[in-house]
Amino acid sequence: MCMKLKTITAAMLFGCLCAGAVYAAGEVEKREGMMKQIGGSMGALAAISKGEKPFDAAAVKAAVTTISTNAKAFPDQFPVGSETGSAAAPAIWENFDDFKAKAAKLGTDADAVLANLPTDQAGVATAMKTLGADCGTCHQTYRLKK
């Protein structure tokens, strides 16, 4: 009986450990997906700001909306236990309040752009400077160098 109990306990413990690893991997994939969406949105805005694509108010609004939405949800994708397996620096978890503040600033700045949506290429370029600076500040501190 004692041996069965030890075996069952060991199996349950192993299952919990595996479930935790799967959960963390899911969080990494989710946040990487969100970051790719932000990157794609920034790319779309950059193409308009450089004149590579014509100004399209709907495309600008969609891109900035994605940035705003993802920036606000982003900190929730970094639970304790998801520190490995991505380009996320350990500094995120060491300075989580600052990380959250940087994400919030990106969200707030994106909301400001949405409230005063650019009406031309120059306006998109101005918005890109602000949003790009927010991205760069966070990446410089909280993204591992490749």
Curated annotation (Swiss-Prot):
GO terms for cellular component: periplasmic space. GO terms for molecular function: electron transfer activity; heme binding; iron ion binding. Binds 1 heme c group covalently per subunit. One of its GO terms (biological process) is electron transport chain. Residues 1-24 form the signal peptide. Keywords: Electron transport, Heme, Iron, Metal-binding, Signal, Transport. It comes from the Bacteria. Heme c binds at residues 35, 135, 138-139. Gene3D superfamilies: Cytochrome c/b562. Low-spin monoheme cytochrome c. Monomer. This is Cytochrome c-556. It comes from Agrobacterium fabrum (strain C58 / ATCC 33970) (Agrobacterium tumefaciens (strain C58)).
